[in-house]
Design a protein with these regions (language model features):
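Conserved ABC ATPase signature
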Residues: 141-145, 149
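Helix-to-loop junction immediately C-terminal to a conserved catalytic motif
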Residues: 56
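The feature captures the beta-strand-to-loop junction immediately N-terminal to the Walker
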Residues: 41-43
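Conserved ABC transporter NBD signature motif
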Residues: 64-75, 83
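Conserved ABC ATPase "signature" region
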Residues: 119-137
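H-loop/switch region of ABC-family ATPase nucleotide-binding domains
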Residues: 201-202
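Catalytic Walker B motif of ABC-type/P-loop ATPase nucleotide-binding domains
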Residues: 166-169
Length: 284
């Protein structure tokens, strides 16, 4: 899906298995390119979380190669530090990611572990707090924050590392509609900065709005890796992976069928795009 010179992270022919378990990954190959917006889809146990842990170097494959910017990643500490500095993971449950007694201390933890100069640590922390609108929370204990606020802190943790790739595991889980909207605004901003965003989600409506590319996992294998529109048009893959079509996608298809609309025009992904799509369809 990406050009060779745009590839940041490459997983080539990788297999992984957990002890005494059939779950894992079977001979998968994926390239993550600069600035991509990717949705990782599939049922529970499909291999999405294992894929994320391999991408971040937390797990090691028993077969295949994992590369970052064209270089193989070994078990050396220097390799792993460089990898985790550039490939960050925002876990589903922020409670499991936050360890410090204040928001400021939490966000500074990563840069300090990189052994950066104090001035550079402060610069990164200030920038991350500002990006996530957390300046007013800097001295507050994270355990007293709401779920949405904790999610923002966990994202600020990763931003302070200044990564090139961020992996989000079920980022909309347990968030109310207002915080989902704030999260999507944040993702738009990060994407505008050229950061590669990879999101594992069960929310197909969110995936369709957010991503330009979809990777579908099932039984530890990749069923499909293509443009997000093509993912949701592949009925066989959706059935095998237990996925459904996004509501706005199904509605748009129905409108097109009923009005005889132009099949070459892209289907809308947002309410605003749907308004324009309806206007064009009504004219026909």
């Amino acid at each position: 899906m990406t050009e060779k010179n745009d590839t940041l992270r490459e997983i080539a022919g990788v297999s992984f298995a957990y002890p005494d378990s059939e779950k894992g990954l079977k001979n998968i190959s994926v390239k993550l390119g600069k600035g991509e917006r990717i949705a990782v889809l599939g049922n529970n146990g499909a291999g999405k979380s294992t894929f994320f842990l391999l991408c971040n170097g937390i797990l090691k494959p028993y077969e295949g190669k994992i590369l970052y910017e064209g270089q193989g990643v070994t078990g050396k500490r220097s390799d792993l530090v460089n990898l985790r500095k550039n490939v960050g993971v925002v876990f589903q449950d922020a409670e499991n990611q936050i360890i410090a007694s204040t928001v400021e201390g939490e966000v500074s933890f990563g840069p300090m572990n990189l052994r950066l100069e104090k001035q550079e640590v402060c610069r990164r922390v200030e920038k991350a707090l500002e990006e996530m609108d957390l300046h007013g929370y800097r001295h507050r204990p994270p355990q007293y924050l709401s779920g949405g606020e904790k999610k923002r802190v966990s994202i600020a943790d990763i931003l302070a590392m200044e990564p090139k790739i961020i992996l989000f595991d079920e980022p909309t889980a347990s968030l109310d509609p207002q915080n989902v909207a704030l999260l999507e605004d944040t993702l738009e901003k990060l994407s505008g900065e050229g950061i590669t965003l990879v999101v594992s989600t069960h929310d197909v409506d969110f995936a369709y709005r957010f991503a330009s590319r979809g990777i579908v996992f099932s039984g530890g294998e990749i069923l499909l890796d293509t443009e997000i529109d093509k993912v949701f048009s592949d009925t066989a893959v959706l059935e095998k992976s237990g996925l459904c079509k996004p509501l706005i996608y199904e509605m748009s298809q129905l409108i097109r069928e009923k009005t005889g609309g132009n099949s070459q025009l892209p289907l809308p992904k947002t309410i605003k795009e749907m308004e324009a799509f309806l206007s064009e369809s009504i004219k026909l």
